[in-house]
Amino acid sequence: MSSTAFTSSLSNWDLYPTNGSITPHLLLVGAQILFLSGPHFHGRRTLAATTILSLAAIAQYNRFTNNPGVANLFALAWPHWLSAVEKIVFASPEGPEADLWRVDRVPREAMSWPVFGWRKVKWAVTLLLNLRGIRWSFQVKNVPKMPERMTRGQFLRWRLGELVWVLLMTDLVSQMMLRFFFTDAAGALGNLDSKYITIRDARWGWSLLKALTFGLGPYFFINMQYLVVSILAVAMGISRPEVGSCPPRRSNRQPC
């Protein structure tokens, strides 16, 4: 049976078979760190772009899990590997090490570090996680200055409190989504075909509540991921605790 015929034969609630491997996904992560923390050499741009883009394409054809939590981690990896390609391909002739540094450190600090050493690996990982370049030489515009600082302990206590709040709200929104979008008219949970999912309702109040629930789901899930990353990064010393670093258009609860 061809791939197209097989796909069309699936109903909306059927899951694709997990006949792939997690290896390309892990290699994709490793390749980004490898090329950023490795030496600068002729052909680095071409080799890095070819390797990362090839692994990204191969990873798309390797379904290794139907667990939404695990799959979500790798499904959201695309901005990170795109960022790695951009920073290497469009770097100056001396490489990204000459362009990217933390504003409170010595400029071009990574150029003096041993390749694949701990400091350069940590620099590469921090660079990949900090997509908006907060406190880096490539920081995005319109980030407000926040002179107030927190100690590591204060920051971790504050963020852990935020994480508890977000986890509670995530659980509440998840239960609301199950009730609104995955429960049929008879009250059976999980039997509703996804093609019938809609925020429309004959009663405008319920329609508004469904739309709010649909929007709050990604909001709290993404906030939860940012909080966990910020807690781990500060706890391990990869990042420094900062009170504020987000543009005003985003919630002040969301770490960067």
Swiss-Prot record:
Q: Which GO terms describe its cellular component?
A: membrane
**In its keyword annotation, does this UniProt entry include Ligase?**
no
Residues linked to a glycan:
19
Keyword Nucleotidyltransferase included in the entry's annotation: no
The portions of this protein that span the membrane are 21-41, 163-183, 214-234
Q: Keyword set for this entry?
A: Glycoprotein, Membrane, Transmembrane, Transmembrane helix
Determine the domain of life of the protein's source: Eukaryota
According to its UniProt record, where is this protein located?
Membrane
Function comment? Part of the gene cluster that mediates the biosynthesis of aspirochlorine (or antibiotic A30641), an unusual halogenated spiro compound with distinctive antifungal properties due to selective inhibition of protein biosynthesis, and which is also active against bacteria, viruses, and murine tumor cells. The non-ribosomal peptide synthetase (NRPS) aclP is responsible the formation of the diketopiperazine (DKP) core from the condensation of 2 phenylalanine residues.
Protein name per the record: Aspirochlorine biosynthesis protein F
What is the species of this protein? Aspergillus oryzae (strain ATCC 42149 / RIB 40)
Q: What taxonomic classification does the UniProt entry list for its organism?
A: Eukaryota, Fungi, Dikarya, Ascomycota, Pezizomycotina
